[in-house]
A protein has these predicted regions:
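Phosphate/nucleotide-binding beta-alpha loop and adjacent structural elements of enzyme active sites
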Residues: 1-170
Length: 170
């Protein structure tokens, strides 16, 4: 049923609208406590055991904010969340999903071994019929029907050189 809904949304909405709808459904499910036994979403429910108030966290590949938003609530006003998301359309939805999370900073890059422009691709629609969020990869070998994005890659050691502490990395 979930896959059918994803296919319908992906085929009828523009990409950003699809991502907004999918993320809205996730956050509703999360608030209701659904998905605890789903392989795709179970880990977000473990965050309160891994992070605490006042922590500094980095969310690498923040995607639509499925971890950054709960982390923002957990670390509270004394903590900080650094969300790294290189894909522009995904980052726009991430910003929307993190409205009001004053302790989150969003970085518009991927993390890697060097500072350079990269191509990221997602060819999950070929296999599933819809774009699987969180399935973007770096490389020029995108298959037929792949969605591609240009992004910046930055060295994490440089990007986060000024952090005084780091308590949690996803």
């Amino acid at each position: 049923m979930k896959a059918l809904l994803h296919k319908i949304l992906y085929r009828t909405l523009p990409l950003e609208g699809y991502l907004r709808a999918v993320s809205r459904l996730f956050f509703i499910s999360y608030r209701l406590g659904l998905g605890r036994r789903s392989a795709a979403t179970e880990y977000v429910y473990h965050l309160p055991r891994l992070a605490k108030a006042g922590d500094t966290a980095i969310d690498i590949g923040a995607n639509l904010g499925y971890y950054a938003r709960p982390l923002s609530e957990i670390v509270g006003t004394a903590g900080r969340v650094h969300a790294v998301e290189p894909v522009p359309v995904v980052r726009r939805v991430l910003r929307r999903n993190l409205r009001g999370c004053r302790n989150v900073e969003i970085f518009d890059c991927a993390l890697g071994a060097e500072n350079k422009e990269i191509t990221m691709s997602n060819d999950s629609a070929r296999e599933t019929g819809y774009l699987g969020t969180g399935r973007n990869f770096v490389g020029d070998a995108a298959g037929e029907g792949a969605v591609t994005f240009t992004a910046r890659m930055r060295r994490g050691s440089e990007l986060f050189a000024g952090l005084e502490r780091l308590d949690f990395v996803k």
